[in-house]
């Protein structure tokens, strides 16, 4: 373990093994990280400090560097998390969840009650988390009002009930004012309210109300009736807003922000948004969140989690966790709407003026090129208009003039075709062309601009370094300008996604053409029908027979296609 000397020199002597490293100021860590290869990762920190303000602060504020070698990357991950929670370093985001968000705990006692707790190490059933603590306390109060679970802890033996009984918040099991059977039904009803599983408990409540009415216990009848109304209203709400799974957390990365949606009882119950300084922080935020919070049965992300992180989450859950990339469409829209909010217009004006020397543009067009080893070369044009992405203005281009790998020529064709449409007045003139790439792509954009006479500012954005290249030769470190980074990063990522999806669609169509041309009984007319109605051959073979007959296709052709696919 290295203990003395300058940080830069220590980095050069780091081992090429998995482990955890600690940048320290005095005896206190200011940043803790893990790596599969310690030396390689530390050299990345050193290089990034030349242009990234956070990395520069870590290096410049450190006077010592230590590391701990582990047997594998998973051990390094576990150790990293424990050390971050222990030392809470200044530049780590993982520790910033404190003791976790509030949860509701249905205790495991003879007469259970409901409590607001933090963390996951508790005896009983946990519900939540609640990202706003006041909401947890409101639900707790509702449960006491409706089901009168005891409010004292621990359960004392009294001869007279406390004030909460007289306020209608407690059924006073301490005084024997409620039977064990009656109290258990109240607990079941409270659980049903928290889980949304009301079908089983409602018949029991109806039986109880009938029993109380026969015994002329009308006050208890009214109390049970209130419980029934609350649970039936809950069931109605679920029928309208039900999602395709009961419980899950959804993490959605959108530009430089990470959204979190909590789904419980098939309903969206909470949302949270985290601003990220770098892509590396994504997994750190998730690990920090689950260090202190409940892990549900399903975790959904629109990005890939490392196997080490998945393993750690499973171990934290002490049970099965399903990882998925399939986000329900309705929730994706909620996430994008919320993650797109919050751009400070004053800061945006300042960053455009200071860094790019221009006012905030009304229209930005983003471009990218995609191909598959030189085949199906396509280009994308996405449009940012009035502060948000305008999907109705997106356009895709199939490159016609080249048939080999040459991104520059492909880009030149796409930009030229776009410029002609702009100059003809067919589309609104943009203020900026933002091209995914480096200096080479920038030069192509400048060349097309000059040749066509189009009045537009041209920038390119390099993915790895997140650097904007300008026409006057400047290089702007985008991560140092978070609002500009969010806008340009979103446009660049969307252009990349749109180009890639079109490339895949063309490849799939070519694959379909190849298979269908080999099957007897499928002529040109039927091919056109299949292309028009089915995106892939797998969609075709999954289609119902009635649908195929309606399209004039014999369902037996599905079996022929299956043979070729297998």
Curated annotation (Swiss-Prot):
Family: Belongs to the UvrC family.
HAMAP family cross-referenced by the UniProt entry: UvrC
Protein name: UvrABC system protein C
UniProt xrefs under InterPro entries: GIY-YIG_endonuc, GIY-YIG_endonuc_sf, GIY-YIG_UvrC_Cho, RuvA_2-like, UVR_dom, UVR_dom_sf, UvrABC_protein_C, UvrC
Gene Ontology molecular function, alphabetical: DNA binding; excinuclease ABC activity
CDD domains in alphabetical order: GIY-YIG_UvrC_Cho
Main location: cytoplasm
All copies of domain GIY-YIG, residue ranges: 16-93
Any single Pfam family the record assigns to this protein: UvrC_RNaseH_dom
Species this protein is from: Aquifex aeolicus (strain VF5)
Domain UVR: from-to ranges: 199-234
Subunit annotation: Interacts with UvrB in an incision complex.
Keyword annotations: Cytoplasm, DNA damage, DNA excision, DNA repair, Excision nuclease, SOS response
């Amino acid at each position: 373990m290295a203990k003395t000397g300058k940080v830069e020199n220590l980095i050069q002597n780091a081992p090429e093994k998995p482990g955890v490293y600690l940048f320290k100021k005095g005896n206190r860590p200011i940043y803790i990280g893990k790596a599969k290869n310690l030396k390689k990762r530390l050299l990345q920190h050193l290089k990034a400090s030349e242009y990234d303000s956070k990395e520069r602060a870590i290096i410049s504020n450190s006077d010592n560097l230590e590391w701990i070698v582990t047997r594998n990357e998973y051990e390094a991950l576990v150790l990293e998390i424990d050390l971050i929670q222990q030392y809470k370093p200044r530049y780590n985001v993982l520790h910033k969840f404190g003791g976790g968000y509030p949860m509701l705990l249905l205790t495991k006692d003879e007469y259970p009650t409901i409590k607001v707790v933090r963390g996951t190490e508790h005896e009983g059933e946990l519900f939540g988390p609640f990202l706003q603590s006041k909401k947890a306390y409101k639900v707790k109060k509702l449960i006491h009002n409706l089901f009168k679970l005891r409010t004292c802890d621990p359960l004392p033996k009294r001869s007279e009930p406390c004030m909460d009984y007289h306020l209608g918040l407690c059924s006073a099991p301490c005084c024997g004012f409620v039977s064990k059977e009656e109290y258990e039904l109240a607990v079941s009803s409270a659980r049903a309210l928290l889980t949304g599983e009301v079908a089983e408990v409602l018949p029991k409540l109806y039986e109880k109300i009938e029993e109380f009415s026969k015994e002329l216990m009308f006050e208890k009848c009214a109390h049970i009736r209130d419980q029934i109304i609350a649970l039936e209203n809950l069931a109605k709400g679920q029928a309208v807003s039900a999602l395709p799974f009961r419980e899950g957390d959804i993490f959605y990365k959108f530009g430089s922000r990470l959204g979190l949606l909590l789904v419980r009882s098939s309903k969206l119950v909470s949302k949270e948004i985290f601003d990220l300084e770098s892509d590396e922080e994504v997994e750190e935020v998730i690990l920090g969140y689950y260090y202190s919070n409940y892990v549900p049965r399903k975790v959904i992300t629109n990005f890939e989690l490392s196997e080490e992180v998945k393993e750690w989450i499973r171990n934290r859950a002490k049970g099965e966790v399903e990882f998925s990339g399939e986000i329900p469409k309705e929730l994706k829209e909620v996430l994008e709407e919320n993650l797109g909010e919050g751009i400070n217009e004053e800061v945006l004006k300042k960053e455009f003026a200071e860094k790019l020397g221009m006012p905030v543009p009304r229209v930005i067009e983003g471009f990218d090129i995609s191909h598959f080893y030189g085949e199906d070369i396509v280009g994308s044009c996405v449009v940012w208009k009035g502060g948000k992405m305008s999907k109705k203005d997106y356009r895709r281009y199939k490159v016609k003039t080249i048939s080999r790998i040459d991104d520059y020529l492909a880009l030149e064709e796409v930009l030229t075709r776009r410029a002609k449409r702009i100059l003809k007045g067919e589309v609104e003139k943009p203020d900026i062309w933002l091209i995914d790439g480096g200096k080479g792509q920038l030069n192509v954009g400048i060349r097309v601009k000059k040749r066509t006479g189009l009045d537009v500012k041209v920038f390119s954005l390099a993915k790895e370094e997140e650097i904007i290249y300008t026409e006057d030769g400047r290089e702007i470190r985008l991560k140092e300008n978070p609002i500009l980074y969010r806008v340009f990063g979103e446009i660049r990522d969307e252009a990349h996604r749109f180009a890639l999806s079109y490339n895949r669609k063309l490849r799939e169509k070519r694959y379909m053409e190849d298979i269908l041309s080999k099957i007897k009984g499928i002529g040109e007319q039927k091919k056109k029908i299949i292309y028009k109605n089915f995106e892939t051959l797998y969609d075709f073979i999954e289609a119902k027979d009635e649908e195929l007959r309606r399209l004039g296709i014999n369902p037996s052709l599905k079996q022929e296609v299956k043979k070729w696919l297998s």
